[in-house]
């Protein structure tokens, strides 16, 4: 049961601010909502303090901004300066083209003359300094009321705060007990980057030399949005976010005719409130371990689709300088008996394991070995690791190493090389249902198949059938984009839901448009209802593009066979969507790093 904040000492402020938020424009909202940090808080004061950038009147970031973090050798003090400085610890540029292309672009580099820890902290600092307005708006659109400030489920929020604090404390102990471990070195760097992001946003620059704290309900919330999907049921949250059957991404890996190329594509399914998007390029200079004799990590250079204030992808889709492309779709867990494996000690949350594996791995097998350590049982996904180093254009199957598949649920991780299957069938499709029978059965999906039918089966799900039917049409990049944006639910028989009224359902497509389902329809489970949810992008790369850390990308809900999504004309026009374009009608672009 949600506990309203009105009963607390800040209740008058909550009521006043709610009335103000209901009546005001988005521009004014940026100013009014800033009061929240002063007047209200959840169990741990979830809303971050506004940074110095909020002295400006315009809440949108400029078209382009570059900032550098410098270290004063004499005083040891860090300071931010506008522009690029070659001696800086780190520097970043944000180019904001959200209203032109649907994307902003972040280009961030660190300086190998400084130690890894300072580089990591500095990376967080400069990212926040160039994107603070977008971070604020994304926070307001997505997590401002998660465990406060207006109302929250007290019991769950206290359990979540305690879980995260215990987990952070356990990781700090492991870092201290294993000072020479490359694994724990990378975990520490990841948390230092998050610390730098939060410190910079709050207007303070204090590099931590020993133990440091991360706010459990601060910017960590932006990193753990995927982990929360499983922490909520594991911690017995009464009102959980995920809808039964809700998809969370489609992916396709396609071997083109004659084996002349291998395309990798992904589209993210998410709430439309999450459509403030940034494609990020990191050029880091981290070493594998804490001593200088360690070599540089394989995955220092990476490009990924992401969100403001998020230091990993979350979609997930990465192009790595190691020659790997890593991506996932969420499979979840529907077996309550497995939640016992979700514990704060002995686990590293998925978002961190993802970052560490991307840095350290040279191939799919080592990626899986790193990732499966300290399985948290949260953000349970099917991961696909494509190794372009093993792919031979126009050549025969190398037999192994091109494609590794990993599936995780609480208490279980299954890994297999699927190169032979990829070359036999010419494609691998992923659509939120486990491939491995042991994972499928253990995660409780058999019961859902028995109750609801083929919609929850691996081979007969609507997306499985559409991929099987249409993957042979993919002969180039443009055709891949078309398939990944495909949604002809009004005319495609594979989009029909026999138990629904009306039967055509916009969820049953490669790129969902659940906003187009009638509000007054009847549906057997929640995912098929009308929702402000669907496919919100597409990203595609190839053997050649990946060499140049590049991709084709389109932002926003598909409009190929459907009308474009427009906030002002949608049933969800009153949902907060600060900083977003009203009309989402963007074509694919090649990401312009130069």
UniProtKB/Swiss-Prot annotation:
<keyword id="KW-0458">Lysosome</keyword>
<comment type="subunit">
    <text>Interacts with IGF2R.</text>
</comment>
<dbReference type="InterPro" id="IPR043042">
    <property type="entry name" value="PLipase_B-like_dom3"/>
</dbReference>
<keyword id="KW-1015">Disulfide bond</keyword>
<dbReference type="GO" id="GO:0005764">
    <property type="term" value="C:lysosome"/>
</dbReference>
<feature type="disulfide bond">
    <location>
        <begin position="147"/>
        <end position="157"/>
    </location>
</feature>
<feature type="glycosylation site" description="N-linked (GlcNAc...) asparagine">
    <location>
        <position position="93"/>
    </location>
</feature>
<keyword id="KW-0732">Signal</keyword>
<dbReference type="InterPro" id="IPR043041">
    <property type="entry name" value="PLipase_B-like_dom2"/>
</dbReference>
<feature type="glycosylation site" description="N-linked (GlcNAc...) asparagine">
    <location>
        <position position="115"/>
    </location>
</feature>
<comment type="function">
    <text>Putative phospholipase.</text>
</comment>
<feature type="glycosylation site" description="N-linked (GlcNAc...) asparagine">
    <location>
        <position position="441"/>
    </location>
</feature>
<protein>
    <recommendedName>
        <fullName>Putative phospholipase B-like 2</fullName>
        <ecNumber>3.1.1.-</ecNumber>
    </recommendedName>
</protein>
<dbReference type="Pfam" id="PF04916">
    <property type="entry name" value="Phospholip_B"/>
</dbReference>
<dbReference type="InterPro" id="IPR043040">
    <property type="entry name" value="PLipase_B-like_dom1"/>
</dbReference>
<feature type="glycosylation site" description="N-linked (GlcNAc...) asparagine">
    <location>
        <position position="236"/>
    </location>
</feature>
<feature type="signal peptide">
    <location>
        <begin position="1"/>
        <end position="46"/>
    </location>
</feature>
<keyword id="KW-0325">Glycoprotein</keyword>
<dbReference type="GO" id="GO:0016042">
    <property type="term" value="P:lipid catabolic process"/>
</dbReference>
<keyword id="KW-0443">Lipid metabolism</keyword>
<keyword id="KW-0378">Hydrolase</keyword>
<dbReference type="GO" id="GO:0043202">
    <property type="term" value="C:lysosomal lumen"/>
</dbReference>
<feature type="glycosylation site" description="N-linked (GlcNAc...) asparagine">
    <location>
        <position position="520"/>
    </location>
</feature>
<comment type="similarity">
    <text>Belongs to the phospholipase B-like family.</text>
</comment>
<keyword id="KW-0442">Lipid degradation</keyword>
<dbReference type="InterPro" id="IPR007000">
    <property type="entry name" value="PLipase_B-like"/>
</dbReference>
<dbReference type="GO" id="GO:0004620">
    <property type="term" value="F:phospholipase activity"/>
</dbReference>
<feature type="disulfide bond">
    <location>
        <begin position="497"/>
        <end position="500"/>
    </location>
</feature>
């Amino acid at each position: 049961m949600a506990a309203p904040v009105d009963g607390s000492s800040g209740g008058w402020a909550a009521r006043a601010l709610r009335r103000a938020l209901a009546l005001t424009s988005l521009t004014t909202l940026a100013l009014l909502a800033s009061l929240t940090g002063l007047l209200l808080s959840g169990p741990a004061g979830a809303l971050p303090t506004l940074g110095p950038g909020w002295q400006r009147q315009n809440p949108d970031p400029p078209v382009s901004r570059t900032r550098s973090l410098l270290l004063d050798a004499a005083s040891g003090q860090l300071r931010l300066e506008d522009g690029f400085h070659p001696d800086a610890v780190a520097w970043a540029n944000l180019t904001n083209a959200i209203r032109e292309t649907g994307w902003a672009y972040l280009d961030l580099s660190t300086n190998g003359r400084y130690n890894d820890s300072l580089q990591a902290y500095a990376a967080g600092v400069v990212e926040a300094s160039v994107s603070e307005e977008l971070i604020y708006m994304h926070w307001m659109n997505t997590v401002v009321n998660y465990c406060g400030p207006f109302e929250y489920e007290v019991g769950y929020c206290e359990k979540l705060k305690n879980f995260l604090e215990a987990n952070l404390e356990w990781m700090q102990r492991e870092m201290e007990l294993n000072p020479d471990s490359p694994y724990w070195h990378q975990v520490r760097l990841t948390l230092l980057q998050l610390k730098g992001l939060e410190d910079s946003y709050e207007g303070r620059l204090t590099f931590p030399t020993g133990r440091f704290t991360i706010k459990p309900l601060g910017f960590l919330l932006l990193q753990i949005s995927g982990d929360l999907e499983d922490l909520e049921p594991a911690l017995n949250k009464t009102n959980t976010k995920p809808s039964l059957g809700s998809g969370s991404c489609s992916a396709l890996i396609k071997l083109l005719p004659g084996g002349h190329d291998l395309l990798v594509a992904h589209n993210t399914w998410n709430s439309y409130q999450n459509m403030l998007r940034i494609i990020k390029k990191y050029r880091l200079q981290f070493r594998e371990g804490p001593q200088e004799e360690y070599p540089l990590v394989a995955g220092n250079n990476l490009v990924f689709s992401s969100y403001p204030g998020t230091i990993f992808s979350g979609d997930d889709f990465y192009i790595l300088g190691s020659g790997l492309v890593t991506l996932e779709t969420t499979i979840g867990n529907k077996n309550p008996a497995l939640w016992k494996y979700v514990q704060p000690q002995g686990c590293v949350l998925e978002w961190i394991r993802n970052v560490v594996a991307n840095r350290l791995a040279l191939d799919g097998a080592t990626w899986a070995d790193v990732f499966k350590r300290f399985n948290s049982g949260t953000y349970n996904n099917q991961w696909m690791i494509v190794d372009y180093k093993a792919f031979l254009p126009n050549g025969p199957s190398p037999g192994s190493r091109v494609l590794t598949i990993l599936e995780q649920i609480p208490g279980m991780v299954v890994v297999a090389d699927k190169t032979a299957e990829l070359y036999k069938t010419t494609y691998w499709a992923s659509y939120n249902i486990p491939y491995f029978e042991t994972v499928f059965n253990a995660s409780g999906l058999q019961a859902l198949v028995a109750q609801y039918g083929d919609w929850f089966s691996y081979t007969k799900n609507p997306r499985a059938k559409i991929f099987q039917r249409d993957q042979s049409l993919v002969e180039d990049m443009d055709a891949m984009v078309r398939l990944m944006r495909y949604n002809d639910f009004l005319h495609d028989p594979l989009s029909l839901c026999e138990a629904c009224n009306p039967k055509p359902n916009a969820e049953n497509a490669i790129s969902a448009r659940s906003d187009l389902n009638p509000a007054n329809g009847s549906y057997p489970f929640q995912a098929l209802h009308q929702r402000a949810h669907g496919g919100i992008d597409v990203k595609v790369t190839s053997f050649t593009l990946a060499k140049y850390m590049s991709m084709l990308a389109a932002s926003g809900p598909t409009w190929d066979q459907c009308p474009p999504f427009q906030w002002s004309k949608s049933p969800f026009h009153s949902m907060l969507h600060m900083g977003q374009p009203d009309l989402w009608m963007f074509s694919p672009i090649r990401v312009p790093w130069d």
